[in-house]
């Protein structure tokens, strides 16, 4: 039985299924993380926020969580200016070795020769196509690189690490998807007859800002991924920011205004570490579903990150209906499929909205085998205009029995 709150009438509904649930992929690899059962407390406006024991979030102001081994991404701080910095500075959730920043001290190639003018879209496209560790030398100040074409990873080249040093913005100009990896795209070279199950290439983006990426009208693999689209291999985001990225406004499964991931085996979770999606009014990402992160059958570990002002703007949920083309679920995150996991640690989700279900997070494991773990995280003012799970405002959850697990986290509507 699924315990739901129906918005805006706030009528509690009991159901065994919901039309918001879409079909999804499945991988046969078991997850390496086990999750404990958590209690659920109904919450309606005016009641006390749900708080699991010892609710805290990170270190005290003025301290540096990066000095503790295992908690620092090892990345350069971003030049913030008047914009939000990368990540939740108060988050101190443990960062495993696989999730930490790649060492870029000896790059395979460097974009730029020391001036902003030398850092061009063409230079980024060429460097990514060649692969390897890539850094930038665009001068000592922040630089905005207008991407006039998409940088694409070639599957037969070395793993790509793209490190902006905290100074580089890749800007899609509202017309261009910025970065693309697809192990099942013959144009990027097939390296396996099981392209969805291969472990390479590995794509890492760190110390970068992705702005105004746009995949509207991109129909391959179902679309989505305004800033970054990934199918297959492995993928990691460290100390990066995503502002004003967009994908299609309608569609039952299209998603990822910022990031769309498909076909990554669940044994290789997508790591999102110390990164910001939106972060302030006017900077949020937007798509039919999952405006920050969207995937089908892919596991995630989201650590010490910030998600605000992202909005799922589709209508009609899933499947599409007459007069309602579908979508509108998962203001920040949309995870659909069968067997996969989602871990949220040391992160803040605030002021995200969904026209249908899950103002912050839409998590649906159609065969009820998936797991959702929430640790030392805060969820506030995430509006679900259609439906959500009782006791977890801003969430819609269908998962394995006893899920989600929640430790030292807070959930509130105000």
Which functions belong to the PLM regions below?
Residues 132, 143, 150, 158-160, ...:
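The right-handed parallel beta-helix/beta-solenoid scaffold, focusing on the short coil/turn
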Residues 125, 129-130, 146-163, 169-206, ...:
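Extracellular beta-strand-rich solenoid/capping regions of secreted or surface-exposed proteins
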Residues 179-185, 213-222, 244-255, 261-262, ...:
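Acidic/polar low-complexity surface segments
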Residues 17-44:
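Bacterial Sec-dependent N-terminal signal peptides
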Residues 70-108:
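N-terminal pre-domain segments of enzymes
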Residues 164-167, 200-214, 234-248, 266-284, ...:
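Right-handed parallel beta-helix
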Residues 111-135:
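Acidic Gly/Asp/Thr-rich repetitive segments characteristic of extracellular carbohydrate-active
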Residues 1-19:
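Sec-dependent bacterial lipoprotein signal peptides
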């Amino acid at each position: 039985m699924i315990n739901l709150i129906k918005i805006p009438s706030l009528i509690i509904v009991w159901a065994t299924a919901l039309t918001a649930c879409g079909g999804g992929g499945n991988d046969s690899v078991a997850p390496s993380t086990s999750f404990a059962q958590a209690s659920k407390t109904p919450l309606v406006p005016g009641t006390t926020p749900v708080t699991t024991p010892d609710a805290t979030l990170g270190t005290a102001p003025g301290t540096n969580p990066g000095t503790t081994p295992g908690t620092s991404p090892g990345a350069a701080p971003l030049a913030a200016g008047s914009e939000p910095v990368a990540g939740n500075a108060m988050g101190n959730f443990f960062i495993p070795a696989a999730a930490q920043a790649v060492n870029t001290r000896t790059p395979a190639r460097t974009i730029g020769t020391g001036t902003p003018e030398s850092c061009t879209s063409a230079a980024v496209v060429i460097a990514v196509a060649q692969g390897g560790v890539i850094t930038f030398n665009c001068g000592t100040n922040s630089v905005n690189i207008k991407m006039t074409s998409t940088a694409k990873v070639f599957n037969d080249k070395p793993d790509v690490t793209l490190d902006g040093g905290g100074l580089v913005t890749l800007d899609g100009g509202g017309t261009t998807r910025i970065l693309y990896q697809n192990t099942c795209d013959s144009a990027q070279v097939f390296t396996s007859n099981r392209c969805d199950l291969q472990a390479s290439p590995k794509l890492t983006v760190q110390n970068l800002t992705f702005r105004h990426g746009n995949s509207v009208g991109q129909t391959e693999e179902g679309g989505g991924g305004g800033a970054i689209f990934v199918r297959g291999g492995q993928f990691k985001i460290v100390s990066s920011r995503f502002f004003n990225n967009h994908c299609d406004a309608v569609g039952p499964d299209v998603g990822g205004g910022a990031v769309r991931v498909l076909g990554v085996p669940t044994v290789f979770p997508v790591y999102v570490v110390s990164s910001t999606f939106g972060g302030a009014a006017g900077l949020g990402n937007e798509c039919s579903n999952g405006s920050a992160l969207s995937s089908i059958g892919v596991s995630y570990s989201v650590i010490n990150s910030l998600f605000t002002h992202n909005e799922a703007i589709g209508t009609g949920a899933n499947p599409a209906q007459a007069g309602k083309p579908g979508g509108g679920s998962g203001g920040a995150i949309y995870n659909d499929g069968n067997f996969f996991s989602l871990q949220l640690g040391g992160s803040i989700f605030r002021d995200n909205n969904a026209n249908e279900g899950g103002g912050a997070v839409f998590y649906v494991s159609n065969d009820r085998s998936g797991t959702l773990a929430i640790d030392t995280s805060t969820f506030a003012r995430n509006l679900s205009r259609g439906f959500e799970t009782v006791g977890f405002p801003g969430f819609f959850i269908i998962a394995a029995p006893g899920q989600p697990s929640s430790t030292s986290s807070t959930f509130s509507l105000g």
